[in-house]
Amino acid sequence: MSESEAKSRSATPPSKAKQATPTTTAAANGEKKLTNKELKELKKQEKAAKRAAMKQANGISIEQQQQQAQMKKEKKQLQREQQQKREQKQKNANKKKQNERNVKKSTLFGHLETTEERRATILALTSAVSSPKTSRITAAGLMVPVVASALSGSNVLTASSLMPVGPNASSTVSASAPASTTTTLPASSAALSAGTSSASTNTPTAIQQEIASSNASDVAKTLASISLEAGEFNVIPGISSVIPTVLEQSFDNSSLISSVKELLLNKDLIHPSILLLTSHLAHYKIVGSIPRCIAMLEVFQIVIKDYQTPKGTTLSRNLTSYLSHQIDLLKKARPLSVTMGNAIRWLKQEISLIDPSTPDKAAKKDLCEKIGQFAKEKIELADQLIIDNASTQIEESTTIVTYGSSKVLTELLLHNAISLKKNIKVIVVDSRPLFEGRKMAETLRNAGVNVMYALITSLDTIFNMDVDYVFLGAHSILSNGFLYSRAGTAMLAMSAKRRNIPVLVCCESLKFSQRVQLDSVTFNELADPNDLVNIDYENPVERRGNKGALLNQFIKERKFEKKKLAMENKPKGNKIGGKKGSEGESKDASNEEDSNSKNILDGWQELPSLNIVNILYDLTPPEYIKKVITEFGALPPSSVPVILREYKGSA
């Protein structure tokens, strides 16, 4: 033991001495300890010296080594410059390509949503809703297979694609449906819809048998067990893209894409009547602030009647969020009018006041009755009071100028001409592109009223006549007294003010807004710019209302393919000179005919320096307005805040 201890003791001091030698020597010599960076640089120099020595041993002189190093350095610099040029060129090409494929927007109204964007959103959503498919978000967009979305244990179950097969197909399953769905699901199943039966041959036999022998809830669990991200996703045929890359490339607004995907993820909560109303609003089948509000309230009554409260929640808490999904879709048809916004706020307030202990059936019935009462009080009775108040301003043999079409103005003029037997003359001023005044002029003419119809371009001639009053409708009246109405109203009111013709505005208090606006740029609505372009579409698919980003892209690609195919099939040359000459003459004649028939604004989307803006509304300053006639009486525009306080208190 003593020998081993002695050996160990004798062995340890040398190692310690070796470890302490550098520091002690460095301290003795007064040198600093090298840092890691300096050590790495020293090792690098040692390696370089070794390589130089090896090259020199192989017969390469130091001068040659320096020349090789310089050449290598110059080569790297050249490669770096070429790489930068390629990156800059690619960046410019991508920027140019992005500008070409982006939806054209005016720099002044670039913050507003365009009609193309709204229609593309509706197209994407209706494609997803009308097809019985489940969705998932991929790099190419939101992909939907043929089989319905079914998540095990989820409250979202869309089984519209489960086609009934077999003798037990008539039975239905109500337990598997969520509480929020109003449709009954077929109990027996069937794996795929009839429209994709040809694609179902690729499905493995085991999965077909499993789906065919299961009910709807079992199909849901089976589909939930399939990993949509894995390769097994191929067992479900009929993949189609709802938001393809074309749509994403058309929009440079990321928030728009996210809102579209949000709508698609909640597509199972959209009521069919909301889809129908959205289509009517987007295609301008329902025009006007009050008609749009009445249509929305009627549809909300249907939605509330069909609504079923999910388990574990109450109607007063869940119905508000359920209606929010419907409202999000309505906003994509057209921006909500002020009357629609005020009605929605009132409805949500009424829902929040429902007692949670009230049965759902009684609460829904009471809510639908309140909606009907609200429409009657705030719209029908308000219009009747406005007609009574405004009739006192109209005397015998009065000439009245109106602009566009207004529900309350039409009823006012009919009441004075028919009920009160007043001999009045009405001049209906109209403008492109909606020509709303035509409907009003036709209604008055059919009732026997003396009507003159004119466009807004002849305004100077109209006011040179003996005009007594200018009656205007309103989309909204802001809290600072400005009138927010259809484009052209401000010009009409200003021209009347210059000629000392009183301007009277008939407006329900439901149209009053607490928003303050000084120009029509900050907040407005953009309509389709093609409505301002006088294009006679030969193809009915290209008419307004059927246009969309996806459809336009498809038509453009088809035209390009046809043109390319025609160029490929075109003969290389002509053997007969006379034939060539006759073809040249016919070609010149056709080109001349096309140039004569072509509109100057055709293909304006391809011109980068041209933007066509079709705004729907403008602002009329309060100094141009003499009175605002409401159900509370005739008031100056400065009294709008008082009415807002009264309306808010009564609501």
UniProtKB/Swiss-Prot annotation:
GO cellular component annotations of the record: cytosol; eukaryotic translation initiation factor 2B complex; guanyl-nucleotide exchange factor complex
Positions where N-acetylserine occurs in the chain: S2
Location of the region described as Disordered in the Swiss-Prot/TrEMBL record: 1-108, 566-600
Compositionally skewed regions (Low complexity) per UniProt: 11-28
Keywords associated with the record: Acetylation, Cytoplasm, Initiation factor, Phosphoprotein, Protein biosynthesis, Repressor, Translation regulation
Subunit structure: Component of the translation initiation factor 2B (eIF2B) complex which is a heterodecamer of two sets of five different subunits: alpha, beta, gamma, delta and epsilon. Subunits alpha, beta and delta comprise a regulatory subcomplex and subunits epsilon and gamma comprise a catalytic subcomplex. Within the complex, the hexameric regulatory complex resides at the center, with the two heterodimeric catalytic subcomplexes bound on opposite sides.
Protein's name according to its UniProt entry: Translation initiation factor eIF2B subunit delta
Originating species: Saccharomyces cerevisiae (strain ATCC 204508 / S288c)
Gene: GCD2
